[in-house]
Amino acid sequence: MTYDIAIVGGGIVGLATGRELLQRHPGLKLLIREKDDILAKQQTGHNSGVIHSGIYYKPGSLKAKLCVEGRKALWEYCDAKQIAYKNVGKLIVATEERELPNLDDLYQRGIANGIDGLEILDAAGIAEREPHCRGIKAIFSPVTGIIDYGLVARSYADDVVAMGGTIETNCEVTGIDGVGGKSIVHSNRGDVEASHVITCGGLQSDRLAQMTGGKSDPKIVPFRGDYLILKPEKRYLVKGNIYPVPDPAFPFLGVHFTPRMNGDVWLGPNAVLAFAREGYSFTTINPRDLVETLTYPGFIKLAGKFLSTGLGEMYRDVNRAAYVQSLQRYIPELTVDDTLTGPSGVRAQAMMSDGSMVDDFVFDGDAGVVHVRNAPSPAATSSLAIGRFIADDADRRFDLARSSATAVS
């Protein structure tokens, strides 16, 4: 069968994109091919479940724009679909004087990004919001929430199927070839022909882009993040999201406290190099993935720049007492005995060959293909807005309005 559009990747971004395209173009022959046995298994399935406000991102960036738009769209969607979420809020807490300039800059960034209801709290205000948290100054964001993104992704998939789209799982794409103005999408389940292709491959995004002659940069370097979980009898220590003041030189937000929809409280994550793109444990090693990372010039330069930080993260990864000590900056009464081993996730960190880490969403392509090259956090929060952004791009590149009109006539 020939499809109008084949989407490679059945995570939350690929599903949101398929949903948006079918809404705009009823009757569009659309296929989503997902390599795993279930949809949204990788980054979406290991997501911490935070609905981000948009405070962290550079004003004018795609992350800032799409996160704010996507959060509001997500609320509306979940209300309409009766998907539960909670706006539990977030504290971004400074515990030392040296963090105050970055905290103040973050507040101004939030104002510039149009985040509603931001408050500056002193130590007493922090204690009022989070009685067990200690800090000297904090930002409170009332529009930060929590949700189960697996439920959201499955709902998007239901929408795709209801509008006539096709979804294939256990379908690993192995190549994409251009033939006669169309694309042949090869997989372990056979080949299909598509007029246009959109890749939303997450941890495999660079490899998918290179299948169609895309640039080698940005390269995906996988970083694993391990969580601890508060024991049920200690959940009273945390009411909402508690985050540190991020280091602007480092792309990760630092260890934090995250309530979950099921009542759990996650602590973390750390950030250590994963030895496989889907390596959710220290012992999972994929030789191809590891060799690609260790020989990539960008990673070599990054490792030299952040050697001490990386060693500290690795030490905390194998020493729970050190891990908990980093959390005690915010909740001093927390102890190792209050924690259980939690899940892990892998972040697809896009990197350039000069060692710089890509800090914004990145999309590229040509007349027949659109690639999502970098869509880390807050992609889940932003998913509906990202879907609209990609659909806009596809409409321009693929002239879908004319194609749809021709199909109808």
PLM region spans:
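Flavin-dependent oxidoreductases
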Residues: 16, 176-285
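Beta1/beta-strand and adjacent pyrophosphate-binding region of the FAD-binding site
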Residues: 1-13, 31
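Flavin-binding catalytic cores
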Residues: 112, 215-217, 234-235, 260-344
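Dinucleotide-binding Rossmann-like beta1-alpha1 core, especially the glycine-rich loop
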Residues: 49-125, 135, 254-255, 264-266, ...
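C-terminal catalytic lobe of FAD-dependent flavoproteins
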Residues: 297-405
